Each structure stands twice: as structure tokens, then as C-alpha cells.
Amino acid sequence: MTDQHLEDLIVHIVTPLVDHPDDIRVIREETDQKIALRLSVHKSDTGKVIGKQGRTAKAIRTAVFAAGVQSSKKVQFEIFD
């Protein structure tokens, strides 16, 4: 799965969870050893993406890591305001 597919996967997972899908942004920073994907959503949607006790965020992170296994680079995923 390519980097762009990882970004598309994140958007696909997060879109049904938020009230402001137009404010979803996935920023990719890539180095020789890792791919860092940072998710930004509307301020009022942050809690929905994180979920109770971080369960939703953990599930998204697990899906992204599983999809990124084919890459030779380490995948890092963060949610920020």
C-alpha cells in the first residue's frame, strides 16, 4: 500500500465520524526510515475521532499500521488540533 493509500484510508475511516468532513487534513512527512501521518480535524470533531479513552484513535492507528506493514518504512500516526 502506498503512502497516498494510507492517507486515503485515514480519510475514509474518519469521514463518517465527523460533522465537518471538509476540515479533515492528513499531513504526510516522510524520511528515509519513516512515514509520519498527522490528522487534523475541526476542533469540535477532535473528541469524536479520539473516542472514549482513546479507543477510536487506537483503532484508526491499528488499521493504519496494519496497512503500512508492506512498506519498508515505519509508519507513525498522530491526531492533532
From Swiss-Prot:
It comes from the Bacteria. Gene3D superfamilies: 3.30.300.20. Disulfide bonds: none annotated. One of its GO terms (molecular function) is RNA binding. Residues 34-81 form the KH domain. GO terms for cellular component: cytoplasm. InterPro entries: KH_dom-like_a/b, KH_sf_prok-type, KhpA. Its main location: cytoplasm. Signal peptide: none annotated. It is found in: Cytoplasm. Pfam families: KH_KhpA-B. One of its GO terms (biological process) is cell wall organization. Keywords: Cell shape, Cell wall biogenesis/degradation, Chaperone, Cytoplasm, RNA-binding. Forms a complex with KhpB. A probable RNA chaperone. Forms a complex with KhpB which binds to cellular RNA and controls its expression. Plays a role in peptidoglycan (PG) homeostasis and cell length regulation. PANTHER family: RNA-BINDING PROTEIN KHPA, UPF0109 PROTEIN SCO5592. Belongs to the KhpA RNA-binding protein family. This is RNA-binding protein KhpA. The gene is khpA.
